[in-house]
């Protein structure tokens, strides 16, 4: 590669994209700056300049659960509290993310006021149900909005439904509870990837408010994320069931 072009890559990374991983940097640089070099060449240039660390080979992965075959058969809902707005240091926000199990597509991702409140969860679910339909099942952790737990660390009381639980029963959506971080893997991996990418993109875009971040998520980030990480389900049949606005008002 011409030395001048390699220097351009290094300068671009130093001045605008420091902190991005190599793959993310390549995608953004191709889209925004017309970069044409291969991932391997860019990685070697950045590593050679000491701008990114060489990654150790990964150990053997634990066998992961096979995804559901149909789009809409199972969706995951997870909240992540994090300093999403790097230009507003010290301020934490909660992001709610809903991910389809079969396709890995993000169906909903927004920063919400007040953390994982029942109102925020209901808003997120309503948007997904209105846009996509009723999923077969919803996978969540054992947060207070999801399930009644008499004492800390005790088993959930499935006979005492929360407001969200009652809504799921009424709509015929199975509610699956995760009992460990490993069990919630798919949504938490999506959140981890979101953290690694979104924080950097919001910083580069100069975004300082939750409203602007949510607009960026809807208009730019989620479509790009799904195009990059989404996959074709094993069964092309959609399991989402259309739902009318009247049904959600019940």
Where are these regions (language model features)?
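Generic alpha-helical secondary-structure signal
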Residues: 12, 28, 45, 107, ...
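Short Gly/charged-rich anion-binding patches and loops
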Residues: 24, 41, 124, 162-163, ...
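RNase H-like DDE/DDD metal-dependent nuclease/strand-transfer catalytic core used by mobile genetic elements
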Residues: 36, 70-95, 101-213
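Short alpha-helical functional segments enriched in proximate histidine and acidic residues
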Residues: 32, 128, 224, 228
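Basic, flexible linker segments flanking DNA-binding modules
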Residues: 1-83, 152-155, 159, 238-246
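Active-site-proximal acidic segments at structured loop/helix or strand boundaries
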Residues: 194-250
């Amino acid at each position: 590669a011409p030395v001048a072009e390699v220097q351009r890559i290094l300068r671009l990374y130093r001045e605008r994209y420091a902190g991005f991983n190599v793959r993310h940097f390549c995608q953004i640089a191709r889209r925004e700056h017309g970069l044409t070099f291969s991932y391997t060449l860019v990685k070697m240039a950045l590593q050679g300049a000491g701008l990114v660390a060489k990654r150790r080979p990964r150990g053997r992965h634990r066998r992961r659960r096979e995804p559901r075959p149909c789009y809409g058969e199972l969706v995951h809902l997870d909240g992540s509290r994090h300093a999403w707005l790097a230009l507003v240091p010290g301020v934490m926000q909660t992001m709610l993310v809903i991910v389809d199990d079969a396709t890995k597509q993000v169906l909903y991702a927004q920063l919400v006021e007040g953390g994982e409140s029942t109102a925020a969860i209901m808003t997120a679910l309503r948007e997904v149900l209105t846009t996509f339909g009723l999923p077969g099942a919803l996978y969540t952790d054992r947060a207070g909005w999801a399930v009644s737990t008499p004492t800390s660390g005790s088993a959930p009381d499935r006979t005492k439904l929360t407001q969200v639980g009652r809504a799921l029963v009424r709509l015929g959506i199975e509610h699956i509870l995760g009992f460990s971080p490993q069990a919630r893997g798919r949504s938490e991996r999506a959140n981890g990837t979101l953290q690694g990418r979104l924080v950097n993109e919001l910083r580069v875009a100069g975004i300082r408010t939750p409203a602007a971040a949510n607009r960026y998520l809807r208009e730019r980030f989620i479509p790009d994320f799904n195009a990059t990480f989404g996959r074709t389900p094993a069964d092309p049949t959609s399991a989402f069931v259309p739902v009318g606005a009247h049904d959600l008002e019940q």
